[in-house]
Amino acid sequence: DQVDIIATNTAEPDSENRRLNPLGKIPTFVTDEGPLFDSRVILEAIDRFAGGDRLLPAAGPKRTTVQTRIALIDGIMDAAILIVYEGRLRPEGMQVQSVLDYQRGKIERSLAYLEDQALQYDKGKNPDAADIGLACMLDYLDFRQVFDWQEAAPSLVSWMTDFATSVSGYKETLPEGIAAAPWRR
């Protein structure tokens, strides 16, 4: 019925998050069943709590398609986070350019793949887990300024605009200070 969002410092050795999730990664979702970690596990649980077949199709090819998009989006996020960490944790001049290039290549190829899919957001439907993940990932790329995806993937700009203007409450989830984009107005 209710979700409390608790900010955590993943680098803090004695954090509550590390007590709940031995990996110390985010997100961690605490339920009556205990702590759940990994976005995919959490999505499965939320879908089940909501009665199923809402965030993830129940079975068959549609489910596989959604799960494949989720895996691609997770991979883009992993690459983006590694780029952010390389810049944040290594002093300037000690960053490994080949690592940055390799991760940017993953993002570039993956966005080109999504661009080729000619995705369109159906304004009348409830978003599935891949839709939500795609929106969050695109806004994360903007927020961290990891990759200029808007120029590389113009159809995703259109998709994002349709998503953000159709999904109730999405704009309220955006972090402060994120650059102005058409869907944030």
Question: Model-found features: residue ranges?
Answer:
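GST-like fold's C-terminal all-alpha helical module
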Residues: I73-T161
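Serine-centered coil/turn micro-motif
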Residues: T10, G60, D128, P154, ...
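Long hydrophobic alpha-helical segments typical of transmembrane helices together
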Residues: E151-R185
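Short, hydrophobic secondary-structure boundary micro-motifs
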Residues: D53-A58, G93, K123, Q150-E151, ...
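GST-like domain detector, emphasizing the conserved glutathione-binding G-site
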Residues: D1-Q97
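Non-transmembrane alpha-helical segments in soluble domains
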Residues: L43, D47, Q67-I70, L111, ...
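A short, terminal or domain-edge coil/loop segment
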Residues: L55-T68, R109-A118, C136-R144, T173-R185
